[in-house]
C-alpha cells in the first residue's frame, strides 16, 4: 500500500490482484468503515461478492451512521455528519456508488450538485439570553498569547503530545475564547481530551480555519446519514452478491502469533442465539471494527429518560477488542479509551415538531424558512449560556424521506450531561424527551408559561445517551490504537476510529472510509495509490491565511512583542522588500 495525490492515480483502474479468486473476506460490523472495506473489496480488489461476508450483531446495518423511525418512539438520529471537500478517500469511493434517488447518478454527483446549488453557511452561530444572537460575528477573539498557545501545540512533535491533555497546552486565554466555543461544540472536544488529536485537527483542517465561525467550511448530505450514505452502499454491495449476516455477534477472534507471523485462525460468533465458529486460513481475510463510539447507547422516549448504562457488555465492541488485545501487544490498548465513561459521554435528542407553534422561534434564530428544503441553520447553533452546553441544528428538511412535509426534525446535543439545566433544574441524563425539549424551548425564547404545553403537545422528543461517544478523544500514546495492518499480520486488519493511520482525524466519515481502503489495499496488494491526507498543512498559502484569520485579521506587525522583536521584524521586512515573499505576505494580509 502506498499514498498518492493527483489525478494520475485517482483516475486509474487497478488490475485484479493475484490470487484474489481464492480468497474470502469476513467483516466484523457493518458501520461505515466495514462497508467501505467491502466496497473496495468488490470494486478495486475485484473479489467475488459471494465471498464477502458482513457479520453484524444488529438487525440493520450502519453502526453509528443511523437514522430511523422507530414505530413506538419516533424519528431518531444519534448524530450527524459534517463533510469536507477534501475527504479524498470518501469521494474516491462515492464516485462509484449509485444514488438511491436516481441510479443514473452517483452519491458524489448528488452531493456535489446539492452543495453547489445550496451552499452551507450559518446566519447565527450562537445565542445567549434565551434566543438572542450572541453576535460572535465571525470573530475568534484570541489574544496574542492565546494565538501563541495554539501555535505551540501546532508545532509540537507527536512524541511531545503522548498522553497529554488539551489543558496541558491551553489556558483560559484560549478556553474562554470564541475559538474554543466554535471548536469544542463543532467537534465535541472536551478540555481534558487528547492534545495530540487536537493538533491533528488543527493541521488537518488548516485550510478551513476561516470557514469555522460561519460553517462555510462544511457540506452536508440531503437526508440523514443512514439514507444518504449507508443505504446506497448496502444496495451497491448487494448488487455484487455480498452476504449480509444480521443478528450475528462476533464474540471472539483467535490468533496465532508465533514466529513473527500473525494470523487470525478462528471467528467465534453468536448467530440468532446459537454459538458457531468459522475456521480461517491465510486466504480468509478478517476486517475487524475494534471498539465502538456508540457501544452501550440507549434511547429514551418522550416520557422516559435514556438510561445511562456504561457497563461493558460481553459480545460488544469493547469486550471483543479486550479479548483480541490480550493476545498480542500490537493489537492496542482498549482501556486507554473506555476506562471512564464520565469523560467520554454526551447526549443527543431528536425533536420532531408536530404543529406550527415552535416554527417562528426557529425562524427568528436561523433567519430562514425551515420548510424550504434548503439549508436551515447551516450547522449547529450553540447556546453559550446553557448549563448543558446545548447546541442544536436543522439540516435540510425533510431529514427523512418519509417525513411528513409539515414536520421538522431538529437535532440537539449537550456536552455536559451531569450538569443541571437552566429551566429544567436537573441533569440532562436524568431528563425525559419532553424535559429536554422544554430546556431547548426555553433557550430559543418560548415564553415560560407555554413551554411545558409545547413540549408535550407540539413536539415528540427522543433522547439518546452515548457513554463512549468521545472515547477516541481520550489522551493516548503510540501503540494504544493498533495499526490498520499490524506488523506481521497476514490475513487481518483493524478498521474504524480506533485503528491508527497517519495524519487523519477521528470522528469523521473520511477516517472510517480511509481505514477501510488502506486495509483492503494492504492485504490484497491493490496496485493503486491511496489518496494521501490533503496536504494543506504543507501549503504556505493556507498557513499564512489561517494565521491572519485566527487573529481576526490582525497583521503580524500588530503583534505585541518586546522592542528587540519589533526591531528584528522591521529589519527582516526590509530584506524582503520587492521580492516574491513580500508579495505573498501582502496578498494574504500578513503585512
Residue ranges and their predicted role:
Residues 29-35:
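Glycine-rich Rossmann-fold phosphate-binding loop(s) that bind the pyrophosphate
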Residues 37-50, 236, 240-242:
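A short, Lys/Arg-enriched amphipathic alpha-helix followed by its capping loop at the start of a domain
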Residues 42-70:
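Glycine-rich FAD pyrophosphate-binding loop
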Residues 72-113:
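Conserved FAD-binding subdomain of flavin-dependent enzymes
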Residues 100-207, 218-220:
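Rossmann-like flavin
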Residues 203-285, 290-291, 297, 303-304, ...:
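Helical element adjacent to the flavin cofactor pocket in flavoenzyme catalytic cores
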Residues 207-221, 283-285, 290-515, 521-538:
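C-terminal segments that line or cap access tunnels to active or ligand-binding sites in enzymes
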Amino acid at each position: 500500500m502506498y499514498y498518492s495525490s493527483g489525478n494520475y492515480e485517482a483516475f486509474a483502474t487497478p488490475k485484479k490482484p493475484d490470487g484474489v479468486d481464492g480468497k474470502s473476506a469476513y467483516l466484523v460490523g457493518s458501520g461505515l468503515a466495514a462497508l467501505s472495506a467491502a466496497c473496495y473489496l468488490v470494486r478495486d480488489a475485484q473479489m467475488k461478492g459471494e465471498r464477502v461476508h458482513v457479520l453484524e450483531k444488529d438487525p440493520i446495518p450502519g453502526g453509528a451512521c443511523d437514522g430511523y423511525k422507530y414505530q413506538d418512539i419516533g424519528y431518531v438520529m444519534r448524530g450527524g455528519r459534517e463533510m469536507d471537500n477534501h475527504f479524498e478517500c470518501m469521494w474516491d469511493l462515492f464516485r462509484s456508488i449509485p444514488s438511491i434517488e436516481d441510479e443514473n447518478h452517483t452519491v458524489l454527483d448528488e452531493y456535489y450538485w446539492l452543495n453547489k446549488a445550496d451552499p452551507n453557511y450559518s446566519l447565527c452561530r450562537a445565542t445567549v439570553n434565551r434566543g438572542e444572537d450572541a453576535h460572535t460575528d465571525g470573530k475568534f477573539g484570541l489574544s496574542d498569547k492565546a494565538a501563541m498557545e495554539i501555535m505551540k501545540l501546532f508545532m509540537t512533535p507527536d512524541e511531545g503530545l503522548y498522553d497529554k491533555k488539551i489543558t496541558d497546552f491551553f489556558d483560559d486565554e484560549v478556553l474562554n475564547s470564541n475559538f474554543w466555543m466554535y471548536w469544542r461544540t463543532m467537534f465535541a472536544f472536551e478540555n481534558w481530551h487528547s492534545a495530540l488529536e487536537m493538533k491533528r485537527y488543527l493541521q488537518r483542517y488548516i485550510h478551513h480555519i476561516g470557514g469555522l465561525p460561519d460553517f462555510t467550511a462544511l457540506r452536508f448530505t440531503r437526508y440523514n446519514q443512514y439514507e444518504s450514505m449507508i443505504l446506497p452502499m448496502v444496495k451497491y454491495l448487494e448488487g455484487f452478491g455480498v452476504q449480509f449476516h444480521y443478528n450475528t455477534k462476533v464474540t471472539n477472534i483467535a490468533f496465532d502469533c508465533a514466529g513473527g507471523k500473525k494470523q487470525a485462525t478462528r471467528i467465534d460468533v453468536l448467530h440468532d442465539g446459537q454459538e458457531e465458529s468459522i475456521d480461517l486460513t491465510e486466504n480468509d481475510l478478517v476486517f475487524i471494527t475494534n471498539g465502538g463510539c456508540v457501544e452501550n447507547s440507549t434511547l429514551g422516549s418522550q416520557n422516559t429518560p435514556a438510561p445511562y448504562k456504561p457497563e461493558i457488555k460481553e459480545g460488544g465492541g469493547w469486550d471483543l477488542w479486550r479479548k483480541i488485545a490480550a493476545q498480542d501487544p500490537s493489537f492496542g490498548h482498549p482501556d486507554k479509551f473506555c476506562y471512564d465513561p464520565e469523560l467520554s459521554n454526551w447526549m443527543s435528542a431528536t425533536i420532531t415538531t408536530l404543529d406550527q407553534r415552535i416554527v417562528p422561534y426557529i425562524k427568528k434564530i436561523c433567519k430562514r424558512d425551515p420548510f424550504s428544503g434548503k439549508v436551515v441553520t447551516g450547522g449547529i447553533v450553540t447556546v453559550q449560556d446553557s448549563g448543558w452546553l446545548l447546541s442544536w441544528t436543522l439540516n435540510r428538511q425533510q431529514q427523512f424521506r418519509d417525513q411528513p412535509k409539515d414536520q421538522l426534525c431538529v437535532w440537539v446535543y449537550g456536552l455536559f450531561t451531569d450538569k443541571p439545566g437552566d429551566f429544567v433544574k436537573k441533569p440532562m441524563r436524568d431528563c425525559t424527551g419532553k424535559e429536554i425539549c422544554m430546556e431547548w424551548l426555553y433557550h430559543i425564547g418560548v415564553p415560560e408559561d407555554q413551554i411545558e404545553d409545547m413540549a408535550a403537545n407540539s413536539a415528540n422528543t427522543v433522547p439518546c445517551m452515548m457513554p463512549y461517544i468521545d472515547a477516541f478523544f481520550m489522551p493516548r500514546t503510540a501503540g494504544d490504537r493498533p495499526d490498520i495492518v499490524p506488523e506481521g499480520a497476514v490475513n487481518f486488519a483493524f478498521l474504524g476510529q480506533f485503528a491508527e493511520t497517519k495524519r487523519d482525524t477521528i470522528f469523521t466519515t473520511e477516517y472510517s472510509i480511509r481505514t477501510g481502503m488502506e486495509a483492503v489495499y494492504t492485504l490484497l496488494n491493490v496496485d493503486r495509490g491511496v489518496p494521501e491526507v490533503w496536504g494543506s498543512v504543507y501549503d504556505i498559502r493556507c498557513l499564512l491565511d489561517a494565521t491572519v484569520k485566527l487573529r481576526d485579521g490582525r497583521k503580524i506587525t500588530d503583534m505585541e512583542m518586546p522592542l528587540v522583536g519589533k526591531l528584528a521584524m522591521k529589519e527582516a521586512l526590509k530584506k524582503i522588500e520587492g521580492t516574491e515573499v513580500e508579495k505573498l505576505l501582502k496578498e494574504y494580509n500578513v503585512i
